[in-house]
């Protein structure tokens, strides 16, 4: 007996996505069937694993399969599985709402998408393929019963902002999705999805490799023979159940037997993507540890790339039997964008994540896969620079995380990394290219860290470097602040921050040693006085060799923590001791020479005014590097007073 039918509203984000689907402008509406079959395959995988691990679950897993049922008269198409099924709350959570992070970002990106293809890619990235049913259907019905439970749930919607849900009895285990198809419309790319030929074609194109049988009842018409019915005899109609897919594990087939299109469709299945991969990696290892792997480097970064709880994307099989998805032990975290499958030969079928953490074979496979992925990226870098630039734009930030965690592959990672520099506004540079361009006598690789390229180019710290033609790497990702402190050198060249430690770019052509010593004596009194006056803010005041235009700048000790790095640590909840920095002065700047003269000629009542000038000098140095003033109101007050005196 059916329970009361409840009508509910879709979550706001879901309503907007439904509207996109119902009034779809997407060119590839055929992909809805791939999404439904992929969901059914996932449900079968989950049931098999659950039955293996939960001995109390009484289910029959001897004939797990997917069925497709097309009814031409009713214009319906049903995709049915006998997999894990869903409970009522799961239906509401997974379909009635979008219980995912990033929905606001998805809406924004969809609005900005330039064309249908871009929108399709975004929908795929956000993992909401079920909604694609509304591209071809006026109404969608879902019936599901979770394995081990008696009650089932029926869900129905026309995609107009509401849906109905009710509890039912006597439903088979698993899930069936029935689409009430829209009329055929060639102009809108709506085909006859009840056509046996069309269904066969789509399954072959998108889902031939699915590990579970995809079955469909088909009619077979046999003309009556002369002996049986003569000319007036009727043809015989029989119904046969056929398996539409080959179920061949793509990774187990020789590479020369697999077409590029088959690889692409398999990628879309395992990655839940709508676009093509940037690179395909097929490998087979024999010997102590035997395994096969089929990996993909995506073309676009997923929206949750920097979500630590996001899925890794590597599926683990043992002898072609699915064991688990998102096996994070098979790939380091900084390669979490890699998708694909690994099929091991010598491993228990009931392996758990806890066992995997200690498994020697898994660790060996992980090392080999990591090296293979990195070497593939290096090959792309050298042979297909445009594809490499695409890759680096999408995944460079996350790849640099490996410079912190993967010491064994650090040199390789440094080699395949690219950085913006002062050499070119448009083309990033590798460290090897930087080293090739180093000036005669240059021993260090110079870099600057900050929030944006524009901010760094205007930084006082770069003035002398630009004036003398030294190239400086401009590092603007938060991870850059961390890894530069852990990577001492590249190709024997130390990495040197332009804002840390002592940097002397002067030469005998600029000033002699005697001239520098004389200048130091001239400013000695001012430096001592400034250090006392600004002792609450700085640990030292000294003359600079890195300034040519600005009056002053703030730097950090060679092994000190930059303000940006301190902010990163504080944001992560770590205690960071407050450290004072060093104030460097440009001895050639009129403000500094004027301050020296004023300090030298000061009267007794001028001390306060000079101290305020020193405070303003410190504040301008802080602002020039993009820092935040400790007391903005006081700075504004002092500045207003000085400006008033000039009028």
Swiss-Prot record:
PROSITE patterns recorded: HSP90
SUPFAM superfamilies: ATPase domain of HSP90 chaperone/DNA topoisomerase II/histidine kinase (SSF55874), HSP90 C-terminal domain (SSF110942), Ribosomal protein S5 domain 2-like (SSF54211)
Keywords annotated in UniProt: ATP-binding, Chaperone, Cytoplasm, Nucleotide-binding, Stress response
Region annotation (B) ranges: 354-567
Subcellular location per the Swiss-Prot or TrEMBL entry: Cytoplasm
NCBIfam families tied to this protein: PRK05218.1
HAMAP family registered for this protein in UniProt: HSP90
Protein name (database record): Chaperone protein HtpG
Gene symbol of the encoding locus: htpG
